């Protein structure tokens, strides 16, 4: 004869607590799995960025034209990472797995940065072919403008002081260009139309560097004001991320200048100094360019 089942309220309460503990542990473990997957996904993306960059440099060195097509891929990956960053850090844990694949809910800053990166990638593609050089430069010009929109996206950016400084710096740059660089181009046989186009292009780059620097400076001031310990804040990770966008913009500018140096070196028929050869080295220019784009992409983590 089977023994009767005795229902005890204490046993039910104990069982309920055990089930709740089990569910909690499962949720906790699931959260850990999500975190590990996210971490692995970032590592995979950064590995792809570095690997494709090295692959392009090797293909270029070995004159493998078929594989040089991977040149735009590193910057495309950076644009994708920027959008994913916003997706993951603005959603709850239960949605993170989906957001690891499909970007959504990006900030205004991230949108402008990612658009600039994707436009740069298109420019990289066109620059693979000499007959599309102008097309590539155009896409890079629009990419710079997109970065300017990102750096100035804050409503408090354009104060009278900042606006006056921006106008003054651009005017000074134009004057120096016309007084020093323009005559040099004339001696080298460069047409006036090309020299004027370069003036417009470099003016946009100078504006990008200035707006990125002002944005970083204002962010640093905010960080310092929130904590009176100035020295610890200056060397904190927050200050680093606040400054990284300006560093990236300057590196981007330097990479463009290195392209200009390389073109001038070619016109000089090899009669150039060792420093100019180094500055005009294509591989070094690409590394500086990728570092600049990486820093600009990394600036999205400030938000």
Swiss-Prot record:
UniProt keyword Glycoprotein, yes or no: yes
**Highest taxon listed in the record's lineage:** Eukaryota
Molecular function terms from GO:
hydrolase activity
> What is the protein's major site of localization?
membrane
What does the entry say induces or represses the expression of this protein?
Down-regulated by Pseudomonas aeruginosa, PAO1 strain, infection and by phagocytic stimuli but not by Pseudomonas aeruginosa, PA14 strain.
Keyword Transmembrane, does the record have it? yes
Q: Which UniProt keywords apply?
A: Glycoprotein, Membrane, Transmembrane, Transmembrane helix
Topology term for the membrane: Multi-pass membrane protein
Q: Which residues are glycosylated?
A: 62
Membrane-spanning segments: 39-59, 69-89, 109-129, 132-152, 165-185, 194-214, 234-254, 278-298
Q: Which GO terms describe its cellular component?
A: membrane
Q: Where in the cell is it found?
A: Membrane
* Family the UniProt entry places it in: Belongs to the TMEM86 family.
Which PANTHER family is this protein grouped with?
GH04784P
In Swiss-Prot or TrEMBL terms, this protein is called Lysoplasmalogenase homolog
- Please name the source species: Dictyostelium discoideum
